[in-house]
Amino acid sequence: MKRAYSPKDIAAKKWVTLPWGEKWNKPFGFPAENASWFISGASASGKSSFVMQLGKELCKYGLVLYLSYEEGVNQTFQRRMEYLKMNEAQGKFRVVVDETYEELIDRLKKPKSPKFIIVDSYQVSEWEYPDAVALMKRFPKKCFIWISQEKKSQPMGGGAIRLRYICDMKIRVVGYKAYCQGRAIGEAGSYYVVWEEGILSLIHI
């Protein structure tokens, strides 16, 4: 029989949260280090830049693995790395482009394996919803960040929609702004500025 938690049991649970600064905690609060993230956005919304900025910030708290299934390490990806000065995260940030589901599991089973795993994108990975759930259950102390394509302002595909529902942090990037729509909302009305010049350009259109 599975354990049933009492209110006292639940109140006694402790979480290690991300101790990040105001730039991040205002829009996103202080999520647990092992919280699951779901980030969606249309093409050219600033989503990729936001994900890279988040990855760089998380390097302060552990090793980050970026599964770049969608872009690989093409010229655009390289330019984004340079623009965001990802060289400052040398030794904490790793990128793989063609790792299989089984190979990822083998990597994560090793000592000192990555603490934060960014899957970009869920659709291009071609994993099924049960695969994603099984991965998070198998490695409950790790943080999985799922990046999703969109179609008509919604995550593309039924599996992505289901995955969004179960993730702790639900982020949508629109017009170079990242909004928290999930369970750990920060300050009301706040958002993360991905690219200020981009926001200004939209205002003046």
Q: Model regions: which residues?
A:
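Glycine-rich, acidic loop segments that terminate in or are immediately followed by a histidine
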Residues: 197-198
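Conserved P-loop
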Residues: 33-102
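Charged, amphipathic alpha-helical linker segments immediately N-terminal to NTP-binding catalytic cores
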Residues: 1-13
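Conserved small/polar residues in nucleotide/adenosyl-binding loops
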Residues: 203-205
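Phosphate-handling catalytic cores of nucleic-acid transaction enzymes
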Residues: 13-14, 201
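Pre-Walker A adenine-sensing motif
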Residues: 16-31
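Short low-polarity hydrophobic stretches
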Residues: 1, 66, 70, 117-120, ...
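P-loop NTPase motor core
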Residues: 32-41, 49, 53, 98-192
